[in-house]
Amino acid sequence: MKNVIRPSYNLYINGRWVPSSDGSTFKSINPANGEVLSICAEATQDDVNAAVRAAQAAFPAWKNVSPRKRQDILLKIADIIEKHADTLALIETLDNGKPIRETKNVDIPAAADHFRYFAGVVRSEDGRASTLDDHTLSLVIHEPIGVVGQIIPWNFPFLMAAWKLAPALAAGCTIILKPSSTTSLSVLELMHLLEGVLPDGVVNVITGKGSRSGQYILDHPDIQKLAFTGSTEIGRDVYKAAQEKLIPATLELGGKSANIFFDDCDWDMAMDGAQLGILFNQGQVCCAGSRIFVQKGIYDKFVAELAERFNRVKVGLPWLEDTQMGAQIDGRQVEKILSYIEIGKQEGARLVCGGEKVTTDGLDKGNFIKPTIFADVTNDMRIAQEEIFGPVVCILPFERENEVIAMANDSEYGLGGAVWTRDINRALRIAKGVETGRMWVNTYNALPAGAPFGGYKLSGIGRETDKTTMRHYMQTKNIFINLSEKPSGLYE
């Protein structure tokens, strides 16, 4: 199983695999058992400089590649991902800890589809021509912004790489991509598979700690745009770096999303949606439905049945096909989650199920936590306001529409949310009333290409997964044409 992973990975700069300039490396660890999976190069300032120079050199030719040719390349990338989907899914599972059923059925297919989607978008890009008066013509065109720095998180490394790479390549930008040092392997393996597909220097992948190699990207004077997915705390640093250089940044950050259930909801779908909202990827999802609001008429029944379902969830080794929930990313994340569980107890919330590590059935060496429910939570509790980033959900009762809208909006975040009801008018009222960038109706965690995704408030700036995303990697130029043959007359 482990033989799908290379024993070591270097940096990918200018179409070549090169070691760190000072020989630095770090280990990639399997979160399910603590075993070392591979050794990766740790990028230095010199390495980032080399990557930027390669991207700069590649940009003039790449930006002038025809939309048809860029489309062909994006489609070829999608084909390669699909051809090697099983290998990539297993690498992602081993490196990240998420169940193989998720990487096979969600992460890898969705990544391929994002390249196909933006292959279509690149051929539909157009400008605008306007006649301003009888002798003036205005042309509006969109040009690639240049060299971009992209930093992606550990929770969806392969899919987030697709979210970032596909629109930037479609726009004609060249890229320095940095995956998380915790989960670099699937992205590095992708670059091995793509050798010869992209011109040298168009995509450069550097690896290492965010505080080191990531900071070098933020500070580099020749990077013309930043794109980041991760915590709100680090997002602030990214935004400050962009402001300092007066360059644009797109940020997809944290969340504390509201999953709202009315008493007329479809019961089986609602139960499934409550689980999917918080247990998918072990709850390590920025838009996780970590605050569940339940109308009082069904509250007790809802809590009891959801607890039964949580207790039946198969927590296990992520590479086994019957595992429903895998390992948290590392020991530090486990300690953070457990500390919030203790906070919830101290705040007076009722612990209904879970609340501890799983150490049985051969899981004692990994980072496994039982699915956890807190009931009778109030919205001012820390567990209801702060992002836990794990399989811990708070359940709060409500009676009226305006009450639950106010409670849902009582948060500094605004990334995701959902409403479950058979009343479409009510669904639309709730969806419009909740201050969030994505509101699902009778579903959760659907993140397809073609639907814009991004946050309100402290959950981010800009949108992903939509044709408008490509515009984030472009700048607008106006060509102003005077058709008159008469001088202005101002200086006669």
Language-model region placement:
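Glycine-rich loop-to-alpha-helix module at the N-terminal edge of alpha/beta enzyme cores
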Residues: E35-E125, H135
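Structural signal for hydrophobic packing residues in well-ordered secondary-structure cores
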Residues: F59, K63, A78-A85, A89, ...
